[in-house]
Structure formats: structure tokens, C-alpha cells
């Protein structure tokens, strides 16, 4: 499978998705036809989100079609060479995708060769579940099971920073709480600006910040950038 899982879409001083364009170009391998899943967009319309994505990716030769605009979404997924899932609200993304019957067809198409690109909520959707999203508002998605394309949980926008005087939990503490109730999970803390590229069964972390792996009862482990690892059970 070919996956590009990004923590976020925008970096300080850069245009929207600018930092991701070289990564996307590197994984295209001749693919040009893309469907865009805009359902995570809450404060922008799906048309606006789709048009913005299409404009940014056009210089790479990618032809983007919003899945909400087609008469037969399942046929569009089957024909797509690239499936792009935008960030925003993970719960809304899951709810709309599930209600339209898109989850299994998307997963199947990626397993048969389509490139999957997702940022923030889109990275969450590639995981076994969406249980490591940060998002509010919460809507009922009728279940948390996601695409299960990547075998580990991802926490996008990961940071342990706390404002001075703030008494709430750090992000790591929240992840540790999850691992108490679900010790079978492994969670990747993916900071902003970072990503994971998957190809041929190998995952390669990248970005300017440290990516962390959390397991129940173990110390956090830093993933070395550009060092491939196999996240699938042996």
C-alpha cells in the first residue's frame, strides 16, 4: 500500500499544503486522477474545500473531483488513482463517510493500488480507529472503527506543551489514559510539520520534529526521521 499521512496542512510562513507538495509529488508514480473526501470540513463548505484542494494540487498534474459532486461515489472511488481525505473534524468525516457506505470501498481501493493522502482527520481515518483524534465538536459517527490501512493509532498535532498556569493534562497524559483502558493499542504522537510515508510495507517518518511512539507500560520511544520501520505485526 501507498500512504501519505500528514499531521497537519499548514506550517508557519508557508502556504496551505505547501510543505506537503514535494512529498505528494514523490509518491504519485504517474497517478493523476483523484477523489477528494471533504466531509471533515465544518467551517467551510465541501465545495470550497474541494476547490481549494484542486487548485493547490493542479500544478502537480492531479485532477481532483469532490466525492460529494458525483452521481455514483462508489464508481468514482473504484476509478480513482488517488484518494485524498482532508482534515477538519474527524467525527463528522467518519459519520458522513459511513452513512454513504464509503469506508470499505476506500480501504479496498487503496489496498489495490490507489495512493491514500490524508492530513489531520484524514490521517486519523487511515488508522484502525479514530480514538486518538483531538477533535470537537463531537457528533455520533455510529462507531469508531476506521479504514485500518495503517496498523497503529496516530495522534495528529501532537505536542506536550502547556500554557503557563494551565492545570489540564498534557497530550501524553491523555494518550497514557487511553492506553490504560485500551492497552492493546500503539499510538504515534505526530507533531505538526511531520508525516509518515508508507510504501511496500515500510513506514518512514519525516519532518522537523520528534515523532513519538507510546505503548502501555513502556517509556515513549522517539522515531528517527527517514529511518524506515515495519509497523505491521510480524
From Swiss-Prot:
Keyword Protease recorded: yes
CC annotations in GO: cytoplasm
Its EC number(s): 3.4.13.21
Compartment annotation: Cytoplasm
Stored CDD domains: GAT1_Peptidase_E (cd03146)
GO molecular function: dipeptidase activity; serine-type peptidase activity
Gene Ontology BP annotations: proteolysis
UniProt keyword list: Cytoplasm, Dipeptidase, Hydrolase, Protease, Serine protease
Residues at the catalytic site: 120, 135, 157
InterPro entries named among the record's database cross-references: Class_I_gatase-like (IPR029062), Peptidase_S51 (IPR005320), Peptidase_S51_dipeptidase-E (IPR023172)
Catalysed transformations (reactions): Dipeptidase E catalyzes the hydrolysis of dipeptides Asp-|-Xaa. It does not act on peptides with N-terminal Glu, Asn or Gln, nor does it cleave isoaspartyl peptides
Role: Hydrolyzes dipeptides containing N-terminal aspartate residues. May play a role in allowing the cell to use peptide aspartate to spare carbon otherwise required for the synthesis of the aspartate family of amino acids.
NCBIfam families tied to this protein: PRK05282.1
Family: Belongs to the peptidase S51 family.
Designated name of the protein: Peptidase E
Top-level taxonomy: Bacteria, Pseudomonadati, Pseudomonadota, Gammaproteobacteria, Enterobacterales
Amino acid at each position: 500500500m501507498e500512504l501519505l499521512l500528514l499531521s497537519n496542512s499548514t506550517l508557519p510562513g508557508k502556504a496551505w499544503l505547501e510543505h506537503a507538495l514535494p512529498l505528494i509529488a514523490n509518491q504519485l508514480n504517474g497517478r493523476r486522477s483523484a477523489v477528494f473526501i471533504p466531509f471533515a470540513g465544518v467551517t467551510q463548505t465541501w465545495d470550497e474545500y474541494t476547490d481549494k484542494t484542486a487548485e493547490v494540487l493542479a500544478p502537480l498534474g492531479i485532477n481532483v473531483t469532490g466525492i460529494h459532486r458525483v452521481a455514483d461515489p462508489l464508481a468514482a472511488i473504484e476509478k480513482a488513482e488517488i484518494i485524498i481525505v482532508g482534515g477538519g473534524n474527524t467525527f463528522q468525516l467518519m459519520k458522513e463517510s459511513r452513512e454513504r457506505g464509503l469506508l470499505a470501498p476506500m480501504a479496498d481501493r487503496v489496498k489495490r493500488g490507489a495512493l491514500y493522502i490524508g492530513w489531520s482527520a484524514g490521517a486519523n481515518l487511515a488508522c484502525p480507529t479514530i480514538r486518538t483524534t483531538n477533535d470537537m465538536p463531537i457528533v455520533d459517527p455510529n462507531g469508531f472503527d476506521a479504514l485500518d490501512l495503517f496498523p497503529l493509532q496516530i495522534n495528529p498535532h501532537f505536542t506536550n506543551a502547556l500554557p503557563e498556569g494551565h492545570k489540564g493534562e498534557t497530550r501524553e497524559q491523555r494518550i497514557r489514559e487511553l492506553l490504560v483502558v485500551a492497552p492493546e493499542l500503539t499510538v504515534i504522537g505526530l507533531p505538526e510539520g511531520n508525516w509518515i510515508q508508507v510504501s511496500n510495507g515500510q513506514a518512514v517518518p519525516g519532518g522537523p520534529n520528534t515523532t513519538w511512539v507510546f505503548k502501555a507500560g513502556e517509556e515513549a520511544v522517539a522515531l528517527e526521521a527517514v529511518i524506515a520501520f515495519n509497523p505491521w505485526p510480524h
